[in-house]
Amino acid sequence: MKPFRLLILTPTALPAVTGNAMTAERWRRCLVGMGLDVRVLPTEGLAPGDLKGEIIRFRPDLVHVHNAYRAGGLLLRRALDQGFGTLPLVVSPSGTDMNVESKVDAGKDRVSRVLSRAEAIIVQSEEGRERLHEIAHGRMDRVHFVPKSFVWLGEETLDLRASCGFDPGDVVFFMPAGIRPVKGNLECLLGFEKVYNLRPGARIIFAGPSLDADYSEHFRKEVEQRQAFARWIPPIHPAAMLSAYGSVDVILNGSASEGLSNVLIEGRAAGKPLLASDIPGNRWPVFGDPGDPPMGVLFDPSDPDDFVRKAILLVDDAMLRRKLGEAGAAYSRRMPGPCDEARGLVAVYEAAVGRTRGERVAGRG
């Protein structure tokens, strides 16, 4: 008997270095280890006919859509909706699906239609589950919670501090994120200029691809004018991320919307303090569960001065940085591992296909 065939649709996949790509690769590696035949297909720029051809060739037993609006919307096209409407579908909506797209009419309609097709819906945070009550209240019986994990994809060496020309005594903030408005890259850069003026030893490194042409061009020009303290470098190879985190002092997230940030989870696992925008998706990575010590500091994204205050707090207090980083590393050691996450995914897949086939997924054959 052939292995269970799983097709994961995601907006981007390796070699692109994005949160979606890293999540899909983490899943792929662990699910393959459990005996599944997994194919990851990026949907950005993919024509409906090409996806239809891939489905015909691969003949998946189930399709997992990661990001309802950007990846799942393709399945609503007539060429696919009519011919593959009975293919079991699992959807893991993104933070943007739940917090941005679902609040505008066009996006809300697309997200709702994709979720209505799903045999199962995966959330990876309690905040995500609560948000789904608003946008998929009639489908809550199909919502499954699968705790998120992380994995280091290699041990390549990369000293960001040295490669960017910063000194050992500088306090370096690191913001790995694609350059687009929802990530707040430009806003963090402009706010950090005030930090630098008040604390000349503060530095910041942005790493990520251009995901919005106009915004990225504006960002590029602003960075070029601030080379005294800021750098924008290309995406870092996944195999070097652990080393990159280890060479800086603070991990920064300035997003207006997040589901559950890979960067914040990885940053705290690397033992680094977090500075993050105070939005629902960022609170658990920073504060953990009730009774846990904080692992970072939140700032009000609507108040530029609050960003400056919180950043300066971390620049000035090395003991605080160490305490927050140690708390994050300790919490990460208690988190589910990637194989635990994969087992949770398999349980959801079995629930999705079991309604009609009553079969097991992992280790089939």
Predicted region positions:
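Conserved donor-binding/catalytic core segment of Leloir-type glycosyltransferases
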Residues: 166-193, 205-207
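Short hydrophobic beta-strand element within catalytic cores of glycosyltransferases
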Residues: 273-276, 280-283
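Conserved acidic donor-binding segment of nucleotide-sugar-dependent glycosyltransferases
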Residues: 288, 292-304, 313-318
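Aromatic "clamp/platform" in nucleotide-sugar-dependent glycosyltransferases that forms part
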Residues: 256
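A short, active-site helix/loop in glycosyltransferases that binds the activated sugar's phosphate group
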Residues: 116-141, 150-154
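Glycosyltransferase donor-sugar binding loop
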Residues: 176, 203-217, 234
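Short alpha-helical donor nucleotide-sugar binding micro-motif in glycosyltransferases
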Residues: 235-236, 243-248
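Nucleotide-activated donor-binding/catalytic signature segment of Leloir-type glycosyltransferases, i.e.
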Residues: 217-236
